[in-house]
């Protein structure tokens, strides 16, 4: 859920970028525990493919390999979905998020969540709803405070394959009643300061995962009427918060550790990433200005169910940030920093084009958090690009039979920013949506490499635009063989919006998605009630084989009042 504030500070272009940012340390406001290959090393020499225009890297034909295998697909949350807790009733945008474990799949859509079966040791089928649709804040039932009481959307789910745990991150967008002492908003360049704890009595009481009864028609009608009540005035001086829930094992129906961190600034659009030393959660933040929070939560203590810290860097004049999210099981070199990236350009100053991707290195010191470091930004030169539709919240993608166009979120690197280590090779895969020479929209994708000195450089790049249709709002993954898979929305004047998948086999010619397109779901209707389309979506690599890539996205059914979602699993090449 994205918003522009009523007042803006115009953002400077990233080329003019900033000195090292200072750090905000936040103690957990509340916390409790609920009941209940071999390594393939590529020998191809790394070289820069950075120079040239956008057209130089544009792929104008489909790949000649066969498409990725669609192993299974099923209906997720959205219009027409019915599960143990009743029928889906959602709001736009969907804010799709997906996580895959060994025996379960969790999906969150805006303010709702569901748990599905995954064929394996426990279940003999995939895609059967075990839980949901329920409000995402049910994970925090019994915890108390705003994490339990509020449910405004933008919740994101991850599976931490290194520990076999689930992670749910949920922001609170409403200011809370003022406390006796409130944390002061931090500004870029100010000295580090440890923030207050939200509840001196933490950890709170332990409760099992709450499983509600299906709502009655009367309760559903009451919920619909509440949506139409104007929002009450915001209390002056109160803070927001970020809520974390980490399961104590691989069964999502088991117990969870829950945490609340006080945020003095609005915590929009969280994008969690798993890294050995923390859960990295950047947000777009601020109330009357646009800043970025680059935050990290203390993963090891969360996994042990202990009180934990969250530290935040405040960054001015940057695009939407993403931290690298670890795919697979091979760890990065011990103690190496996480890397965070953003596109260039500045929509607020009408700068929609750039020829660089910008990155920072984040080094966390949990023993002495004030010594944590944020280094950067540094520019990686890439082929020129222009934001698809000139950025976010713009009417961009046409649809059949209507003048309503869809938003493309063209100003940002999309979730996830993927990290994969294979032997001594360390890769980062990123995607964003760009204009194309054919007049539609394309998926610009990159594979970066990290050398032994921790320098980041471009290895290959391309813009997938095989025709004049629109391909946008993508999400990438890399499997254990180094194959790259990308799911994305597909549509245009002649095609209702739906979801497709493509990719490439490791070692294929650089800059080309060599696979044909796999259809996940064909759109059946145009979305006419809003321009908002998903805001983001998500891939997930299956931890069971580290090869299968899962993806989720929106589409509309014939006669539907609102979006539906489709979840699918793809495999590139043959399992070895």
Segments from the language model and where they lie:
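Bacterial Sec-dependent N-terminal signal peptides
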Residues: 1-20
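C-terminal PAP-associated
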Residues: 20-197, 201-204, 208-576
């Amino acid at each position: 859920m994205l918003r522009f504030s009523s007042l803006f500070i115009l953002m400077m272009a990233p080329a003019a970028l900033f000195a090292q940012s200072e750090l905000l340390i936040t103690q957990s406001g509340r916390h409790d525990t609920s009941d209940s290959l071999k390594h393939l090393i590529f020998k191809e020499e790394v070289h820069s493919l950075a120079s040239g225009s956008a057209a130089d890297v544009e792929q104008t034909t489909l790949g000649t390999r066969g498409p990725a295998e669609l192993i299974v697909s099923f209906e997720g949350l959205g219009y027409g979905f019915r599960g143990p807790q009743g029928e889906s009733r959602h709001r736009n945008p969907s804010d799709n998020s997906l996580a895959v474990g060994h025996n379960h799949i969790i999906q969150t859509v805006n303010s709702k969540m569901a748990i599905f079966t995954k064929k394996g040791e426990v279940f003999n089928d995939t895609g059967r709803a075990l839980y949901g649709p329920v409000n995402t804040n049910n994970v925090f039932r019994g915890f108390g405070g705003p994490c339990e009481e509020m449910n405004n959307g933008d919740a994101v789910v991850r599976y931490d394959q290194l520990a076999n745990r689930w992670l749910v991150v949920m922001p609170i967008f409403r200011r809370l009643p003022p406390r006796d002492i409130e944390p002061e908003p931090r500004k870029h360049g100010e000295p580090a300061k440890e923030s207050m704890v939200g509840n001196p009595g933490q950890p709170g009481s332990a409760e099992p995962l709450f499983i509600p009864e299906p709502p009655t028609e009367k309760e559903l009608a009451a919920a619909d009427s509440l949506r139409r009540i104007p929002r009450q005035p915001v209390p002056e001086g109160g803070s927001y918060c970020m809520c974390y829930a980490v399961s104590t094992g691989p069964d999502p129906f088991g117990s969870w550790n829950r945490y609340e961190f006080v945020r003095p600034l609005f915590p929009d659009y969280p994008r969690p990433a798993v890294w050995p030393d923390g859960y990295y959660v950047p947000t777009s933040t601020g109330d009357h200005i646009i800043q970025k929070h680059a935050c990290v939560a203390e993963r090891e203590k969360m996994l042990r169910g202990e009180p934990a810290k969250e530290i935040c860097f405040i960054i001015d004049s940057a695009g939407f940030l993403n931290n690298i999210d670890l795919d697979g099981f091979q760890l990065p070199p011990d103690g190496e920093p996480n890397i965070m990236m953003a596109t260039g350009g500045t929509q607020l100053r009408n700068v929609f084009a750039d020829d660089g991707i910008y990155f920072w290195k984040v080094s966390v010191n949990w023993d002495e958090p004030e010594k944590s470091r944020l280094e950067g930004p540094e520019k990686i030169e890439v082929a020129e690009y222009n934001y698809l539709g000139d950025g976010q919240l713009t009417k961009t993608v046409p649809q059949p039979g209507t003048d309503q166009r869809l938003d493309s979120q063209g100003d940002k690197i999309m979730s996830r920013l993927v990290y994969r280590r294979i032997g001594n090779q360390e890769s980062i895969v990123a995607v964003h949506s760009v204009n194309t020479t054919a007049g539609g929209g394309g998926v610009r994708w990159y594979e970066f490499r990290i050398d032994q000195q921790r320098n980041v450089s471009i290895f290959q790049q391309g813009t997938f635009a095989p025709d004049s249709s629109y391909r946008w709002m993508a999400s990438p993954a890399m499997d254990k063989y180094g194959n790259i898979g990308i799911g994305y929305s597909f549509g245009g004047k002649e095609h209702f919006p739906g979801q497709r998948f493509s990719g490439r086999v490791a070692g294929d010619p650089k800059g080309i998605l060599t696979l044909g397109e796999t259809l996940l779901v064909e759109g059946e209707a145009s979305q006419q009630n809003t321009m908002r389309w998903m805001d983001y979506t998500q891939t997930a690599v299956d931890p069971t084989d580290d090869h299968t890539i899962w993806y989720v996205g929106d589409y509309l059914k014939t006669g539907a009042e609102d979006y539906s979602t489709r979840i699918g699993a793809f495999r590139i090449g043959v399992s070895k």
